[in-house]
Amino acid sequence: RSFDLIHISPPINPVLLSFKKKILSDVRGSEIITYPIVKIGTQYWTRKNLRTTLYNDGKKITLKTTSNYSKSSAGYFKESTFIFYNKAAVITGKLAPKGWKIADNEAWQLLKTYIEGDGAVLKGNDLWEKSESVPTNATGFNAIATGIFTKVKENDSSIYQFAGKYTAYWNMGATQKAVAENGILLRYDTHEIKGAAYSDYCGYSVRCVIE
């Protein structure tokens, strides 16, 4: 299944999207980001985490910092080159490129079936701390140990931690405006794919699948 060009023209900041030669080019206003695509079973996934700072209607996503932090407002966190989105941003339904969706529970469960629950075949070779669970990246999914944002116990804010140890992905529910019961968690010390607890303070990565 392939697309030469899809042209979406909202009133402001037109969005251009192309899917050709296993590359997704996501153009949102002046922001242009390309994502390699990998096919696993019958699914087409982005091979890198979403890293846009604009919604797919061209509007800016708020960067969450200690000076403007609010757990109820939509936004993203940034650490190094990594982008993490909070729950409020994810459930806007406006993060994924047109024609794609944030991976939902059905997509993740099908992926688990394809790989027989072996998280090692999803892990890229970069950043993971050494353990007996050795990444193989046999699928080309290229999951990276980006770390996650979680709640600070002492106050109402978020903190970045577990770099090199964990990566967690948002998992959508029945629609793109609701999350499933748990996210998807990969750890450095096990091949098992675990559930990631949610809260309004979490900042997790996003992977997309074609609709």
Positions of predicted regions on the chain:
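Conserved positions within compact, well-structured domain cores
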Residues: 8-211
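Short, small-residue-biased leader/transition segments that mark boundaries at the very start
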Residues: 1-4
